[in-house]
């Protein structure tokens, strides 16, 4: 038995902890059955070995969310923590212990000893350099950088990390992230050796120029950065190298940089000769500038990285000097080129343009994703050169490269960028179509996971909030997004208005959409993410601290919604956006008040549960009283008690009413029957839109209609997932018929319709983890074998470890195998809900 994956604030050791009350967690590795933690003891020491907290022996089974309760943590310190646990099992008592460490952040602005330096002219870019010598042998070196909008950094010619587009996107008026690195390895042994720090700046979302395609123009100021290198010498003395007027700057190779328009890069200013020169013609004194408005905080989420590389599946010359590369899949990121020249091509340009699709002539089509998006590289004299953009990305599959030299002298690869987060699950089954659907949904999720969940990786790149809760359960099956959800809740808190409103987009980079429809600013289905997203994070990760920290934000928003009701019903918002019908994209099948009030009631229900968890009994009772009023008025206005239809009986109206708990018990059967009849009579076609779709899936699962979902997911005509697969989609598209042959339309890379993962994992795989209603340390294993599936293998990660369910049909029976991690209790149930047995950790095999 051993402990592993020791976490501080949900990340492994050597992370930068921004909280003064971090939370700890761990997992247990053992082959023994029914292992359960009986007690733990957490101890924390500072750099000098002084104890700052000792929890003492705590009798608890809890292995996640253990909050620090010791002395106040100090800035910029390396802390060590140790956990020792006792366990019970079928084979008796056991013990295990392990140690980890973490770094505390700079908690105060005064901890930064330097000043911001940066650009003095809009959309002009420089390289920044500092030369210095170490007075003594270096024992430890830590580098802290806040770069607005984004930066890359080198020490002595070595890139200090493989992170990209750091430090992340926020409302820069409120919050500016910084990052930290252990850079000890970049300093050679010995004293008085010259060292060089080099920083490259770009704009990203901080400063968005025009000039090419741009979805919006907005500026939080000119590019700037703050840097602090902390050197700890062998004798424990310290020295700091910080940004000030002593730094030098030179014209950057970046000539144009726009998150929406692309990047132009002059390789002649990215050579050893240029970078190492000391002439005043190239290098001039840096300029100190005003700091950004936002509070400096360590980035709480994992950094972006190049996570996958795609090689071209085909290359063809589409016209003289223009080469088209097909990378086989739609994804988000950039292309990297490798050139070999005779050394006499300096000044020549290579232009790269991208697209998700081809037009009728077989050429790239940027009509949806942003016309004229491009990367341009100007060659230098070196014989071997390499280029990829630094501070922009897009969604694409095809690249057209314009260069007069034969293709054999240049190679190209696609680089898929998303956060450096753990894969949290996967799903496989005997049904090839289902596997393909899972693949395109997962590809869209990864493509749109950046500093927040984007709607698409090209046209808008905005944080439309509804996605965070509508497909939150589906995302959480696949990726560990715990820290990203923490960051996004911070975005919502930063964007909240005085009256409590949470705008639809956070960070709120774009304003003015409400001139077309007020719902683009204020829609309950979007703003309610501030309540529902952290609740799902609590259900999935057990993060009570997140609920406690942001409870005032949630409360203020729900009060705002209450102020907008008329007879307890809400009447504003976008409703069931992009539902199926002739009047898309606006809600046409379901009245807006039905959709908005369902979400409002769901908010009240969740807030009552959160208040109870936080010990706010009177607040919980107030929400429960409000729920009763909304329940009565909603059913008075919308329920036809003769037919069991809500409003016009749409799929969204029926499903949402069921899932949020607005259906009186005596009418449940009628409401369920109406829902099933509507789906079946339409040939298992979907009519629900962005908002209603996940509730439709959840309702069919909850009320014993997994077989209906099986039929819906197997069809290959529109609207449906299968239609996208058979028509060549490699990522989930914005509209159900997006890849229509001869009329490919809309974004070909959207994640908002990806809720089918809930059925794949939760019903076929039998692992319902968010909507199950069970306590955090209990799970239900209830697979539903369907006629189109012969076997399933699905797994997902719980904070305590891996849950794996496999099943295979054998004659008239289905044999189930499951793996339960230590610390969990599993209810093994048949498809009809009969309990087979209750088990602890271990491997189990049984028949259903």
List each language-model region with its residue ranges.
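Alpha-helical support elements that line or immediately flank enzyme active sites
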Residues: 141, 155, 334-344, 349-354, ...
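Extracellular/oxidizing-compartment recognition motifs
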Residues: 1-459, 466-467, 483-486, 499, ...
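Active-site acid/base region of carbohydrate-active enzymes
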Residues: 150, 242-251, 398, 409-440, ...
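Charged, long alpha-helical assembly modules
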Residues: 508-512, 518-542
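C-terminal capping/lid segments that line or modulate ligand- or cofactor-binding pockets
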Residues: 197, 265-266, 271, 460, ...
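Active/binding-pocket-proximal capping segment
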Residues: 151, 160-162, 492, 509-510, ...
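Non-catalytic C-terminal accessory modules of carbohydrate-active enzymes
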Residues: 217, 226-228, 241-274, 298-303, ...
